[in-house]
């Protein structure tokens, strides 16, 4: 279970019901860490709190807050919990919406380890919205309900240690054909102590690899997507199971080309104020 209770384990249960004169409130405690405080009006729950190892206040009317702290967790364990509250929130008789406010010391996501994570999850009709902060990144993840839409990852900050980037680039076996379709953006990207800039693109996997469509940004003085009346800037990454190939096409605006040299630790042999490069 996500809250560290295993099947067959016994824990003390205390429940208090409040009437004034109608049923107004349910207080409960399971063990030392799990606390519930649910409020009612005319026998219908209006708002409340479910808290695990967190000191938080009961939210306003219309919200059920599920707050918890864990050192780490397996995210798959939370799928039934989210589905349970999602189904309840869609009931025509429900007047509250669930909000998950979770904190973790670390999480292993794909090949990355994130630390000091705080996430707030809100369930909407069309998507699950996750706002989060961590040691490496802050931002918002939008997971659409329908399969026809793609997830969106929008970061205000992405700070990668240079050693981590070198490690990931050097990994073998990365297959772009298995990438998940997503719309991605980052407002402030840094690697080590260097600011790289901002970048946004639409990632779409293909049979032969992956495409990065509609690239827009300001990256070391390079500005793909600057010329809105011209074709989009796109990057193609191919993989046939043995070898890789790549291709960048489209126009890229240039501010100061010297910033590119500096960012790549190359001697600054040229400067510019504006310009344009066309990749084909």
How would you name each of these model-derived features?
Residues 1-280:
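Membrane-proximal interfacial segments on either side of biological membranes
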